Amino acid sequence: MHEGDEVTTKEIKSYGNKMRLQEARDSANRLLGFRMRSVFEMKRRLKEKDFDQEEIDHTIQNLINKNLLNDEEFGRAFVKEKVRNKKIGPRALKKEIYQHNLADELTESLIQEVYDEFNPKALIESHLTKKRIKKKTIITEKDKKRLTDFLIRKGFYWDSIRDVYYDWELI
């Protein structure tokens, strides 16, 4: 295009579409600059920015082709980060990952994989240590209930909690 050229309405529309696609790609890349995202989350965020479905689909496919958007890699990084930093149990992790709308089989395999690496009993023990509970310490029923409720809120199953209590001779 040069100065003085006449531009048709069709060409203007074509340039407008190309600009919108570029804006969608730029927006997606900015979002990925902060942290990894799931496909579902990226679609939602682009929709919030008023991009139409065609622009969103094109941008998502472009990111997937460039391997910048990958649910499995996102899920693996997400579950590791949550368990490593928050030391949460399987139930809480499942609740947190549910928001990202990953496939059920993928979610289950990621949870299994992360708890093969981070033993739930070791995580419970780290919470007990942080709460300054020592092995073979006698604690009141009230304190035991508070501790149990805390661990259940952290997403651990009663069976794991009970096993640690027996190992530490708290029961």
Where are these regions (language model features)?
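An alpha-helical, amphipathic repeat domain used for nucleic-acid recognition
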Residues: M1-I171
